[in-house]
Amino acid sequence: AIATSRLEAAISIIRISGKGCIDFVQSFFTGNLNKKSQTISYGYIVDGEEKVDEVLISIYRGKHTFTGEEMVEINCHGGVFITNKVLSLCLKKGARMAEHGEFSRRAFLNGRIDLSQAEAISDLITANNDQAAKLALKGIQGNITNFIKDLKEDLIKIITQIEVNIDYPEYEDIEELTAEKLLPGSVSLRKKMDDILDRSKNMHLIKDGISTVIVGKPNVGKSSLLNALLEEDKAIVTDIAGTTRDVVEGSIRLNDIVLNMIDTAGIRETEDKIEHMGVKKSLSLIDQADLVLVVLDGSRPIEAEDKELLERTEGLNRIVLINKSDKGCVIDTEGIHISAKENHIDELIQHIKDEFDFSAITNSQAQVLANQRQVQLLEKASQSLNVAIQAMEDGIPTDLIVTDLYDSWENLKEILGEQAKEDLLDELFKRFCIGK
């Protein structure tokens, strides 16, 4: 497969993997590939007597390659035509096109990476900010692998203690095990799991961005705020109330924070059916948002619609903005004073940067999970362990507790893909490009 972009460039890389692939490429390469692993050879790709391209070829032998099998990478000139010509020759000689993510899938199946590392590769490719890239790289390096293995080891020690007592009760040198003796280690392990879950709850904000909804009654400056944040005229700005009848979206980057902005229709009572639908949609988006920006017009007294909106968003993660500060302020509601029309929003931007600063996690060896699949499995592991702990506290015999402990252990194994289902692998690797 072509592992680089199919665009004109200095170099294109064609990747081949599988037993015998080095000898296969040697059959139409003029250079010498009879060298040790991780070496580069110069020569020409030839089709019979015709020279097709001048290339450098990297070879990787043995099981210590990315895929866990022999690999070849042909570095040819980066023209689209010449790259396709070399690829076509490889196919004519007997190779087949790789499927999406097949190289990474082979790496997983051959034990070179586990499922969490495969997911991290996908995350690094799609990362849209530095913090997401750092987290993904840690995943590739085995950060998740290591702490999940530690949890598994702690859990299997507890299970082993129980199994030994069940299978060999007649041995006098084996101390009789009671639920009371199992409790301290089990409770400590549950705390480790719950701490990881607590640290992982905001990972989707780093990877996917912060869903940010701008709400307020009509003509308070919501669209002006969106345009000021986006630094472009994305929303229509007029003095006519109800101009924005549906949602308007855009994304902005504040350092390493990505805000997925949604400007909603002004919230008010209206007879206009189309505007009413927009208002209804605005209200539904409030509950789904990670951050709600409530915009008030500071140049006019607070009205019933403002109060209703403040009550509606109380308890949510919100920032109250007093807009039109350039016209003077006649309300005493607590909030950040801005002038969206004049682009005076620096205090708001700094507030968001401070609130969503994840550097303590991304710049450390903090134990965090990368996605919802992993979080759900660790939640299940913690829940099963908690059932076992409750049984211990109730004095239930240890041989009846071990089933829940095994359930917890199986969920930990699934995080690393040790018993991954085929459809899960298909779903993951089809997200990869063909050459990865």
Language-model regions: role of each:
Residues 1-134, 138, 142:
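A glycine-rich (often HGG/GG-containing) alpha/beta subdomain
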